[in-house]
Amino acid sequence: MEFSIEIALPSGKKIRVKELKNSEYLSIIKFTENRDFKGLNDFFEALYIRPDLNIIDRIYLLLYIRMTFIEPDINITVDNKSISISVASMLDKIESSYVDLETTIEVNGIVVTLDLPCISYYETVDDLLIATIKHIQIGNESIDYNELDDEVREEVLSNLPAALFGRVTSFIQTIQDNILNCELIEENKSLGIDGVAISLMSGNMLEFISSMYRTDLQ
């Protein structure tokens, strides 16, 4: 039986994950060195990420795994001096920035529940918009969108009214208005450290995560 831990996520969900193996960590480093963020995303999804986890839960989960199975601190080298920064402090900041924005809209009798996007890598704005769709109610038919495979998702989307996507775009703006940049590493001028802030809705979020999986940063 493999060792595993249960992680409580900012949304209130819990997930049990198995220990990261050395071979898996080496694969992560290879994806990182080749800047293959799509491949890295697919790798993380196969290992750890459930389809129903939103983007903030995913950031939190991947940093928690880094803290637990690799090292609890991140070492930053400044002027030949190594400075340790706690990953736990980053997790605290992500958790404190979490806002529940789930909302329901109705267009032409179709009721759609929107929430923080269940995505950790996207190449187009359309990918981001679609990832906010959580649940669809059409008459007596109830659809959990996150549980559908890609082919069925495309079929469902093609039958939704065009007016819906204007409402989804407005919801994305609501997310951006409520979830601002999160400063994970505070500026320390006396030590020569620049502050590091990430947008929790940024398309380069996975690039940031990949850098965190290195044990030392320059």
Model segments located where?
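Long C-terminal interaction/binding lobes of large macromolecular proteins
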Residues: M1-Q218
